[in-house]
Amino acid sequence: MDMRVPAQRLGLLLLWFPGARCAIRMTQSPFSLSASVGDRVTITCWASQGISSYLAWYQQKPAKAPKLFIYYASSLQSGVPSRFSGSGSGTDYTLTISSLQPEDFATYYCQQYYSTP
């Protein structure tokens, strides 16, 4: 099983914006949410076609570079707290934060790396 970590390069930022020209379209929901410390939070991401679990989740805080949190749909990047988990296969993927902490308030992005533009 190939569990490649996605390349972290500027070009991949194109995949995070609506209207980017690529073969696979990613849709994330909800666009925004209100949550409190201790809440269980779930974010869902759908691919327009199967991506064989080549799905990464990133966390970004204001004025900071995005950080890879999860790769290959469910593999936690080193140093990421265990309250974060990823799941899914085929076209449907989920990021879950089991108990939201103050440092978790941020923007989260999904990104497929099954194919590139």
Swiss-Prot record:
Q: Which gene encodes it?
A: IGKV1D-43
Major location, coarse class? secreted
Q: Which organism is it from?
A: Homo sapiens (Human)
Gene3D superfamilies with a match to the protein in the record: Immunoglobulins
- Database matches in PROSITE patterns: IG_LIKE
Framework-1, as annotated region: 23-45
Give positions of region: Complementarity-determining-2. 72-78
Q: Which cysteines are joined by disulfide bonds?
A: C45-C110
- State where the protein is found: Secreted; Cell membrane
Ig-like domain mapped to chain residues: 23-117
Q: Where is this region: Complementarity-determining-1?
A: 46-56
Protein name, as recorded: Immunoglobulin kappa variable 1D-43
**What keywords would UniProt list here?**
Adaptive immunity, Cell membrane, Disulfide bond, Immunity, Immunoglobulin, Immunoglobulin domain, Membrane, Secreted, Signal
